[in-house]
Amino acid sequence: MRVKTFVILCCALQYVAYTNANINDFDEDYFGSDVTVQSSNTTDEIIRDASGAVIEEEITTKKMQRKNKNHGILGKNEKMIKTFVITTDSDGNESIVEEDVLMKTLSDGTVAQSYVAADAGAYSQSGPYVSNSGYSTHQGYRSDFASAAVGAGAGAGAAAGSGAGAGAGYGAASGAGA
């Protein structure tokens, strides 16, 4: 009887360890061992969707810090914001969306010159460019991505153009990440 109980306990512990390992795989694989978790916060919300169904959302926000990780693509006055939205269904299938936003600090002369070029009809990355999907990157808002990010609770601050989005890919739905 004791042997059976011990075997069941070992199996249960392996199952729990495996389940937790799968949750943390993305963090460990992507960020590696040089990451420090600065803060972690979990909130629980109950909402009603458009069809009237009641949905419980448990949102976990992690703020992590990784030092001296320059991919060799950033200039002196540039900042990269990476936003990941990972949607997992009950079967374990994942859909991963990664958005990279490169922010450049421009001088007033450069900004004025960009607006003149944009008004003349030329393409300008910092000017009011409207892509094929209909959102303006000048305003820093992507309605198609931001709604997915808010629904998943990850990084909508970066998509909303506040500059306060999710530094390492995680942030609160309010954009309160770093």
Curated annotation (Swiss-Prot):
Keywords: Disulfide bond, Repeat, Signal, Silk protein. Disulfide bonds: none annotated. Residues 149-178 are annotated as: Highly repetitive. Residues 1-21 form the signal peptide. It comes from the Eukaryota. Pfam families: Fib-H_N. The keyword Nuclease does not apply. Produced exclusively in the posterior (PSG) section of silk glands, which are essentially modified salivary glands. The interchain disulfide bridge is essential for the intracellular transport and secretion of fibroin. Composed of antiparallel beta sheets. The strands of the beta sheets run parallel to the fiber axis. Long stretches of silk fibroin are composed of microcrystalline arrays of (-Gly-Ser-Gly-Ala-Gly-Ala-)n interrupted by regions containing bulkier residues. The fiber is composed of microcrystalline arrays alternating with amorphous regions. Core component of the silk filament; a strong, insoluble and chemically inert fiber. Silk fibroin elementary unit consists in a disulfide-linked heavy and light chain and a p25 glycoprotein in molar ratios of 6:6:1. This results in a complex of approximately 2.3 MDa. This is Fibroin heavy chain. It comes from Bombyx mandarina (Wild silk moth). The lineage of its organism: Eukaryota, Metazoa, Ecdysozoa, Arthropoda, Hexapoda.
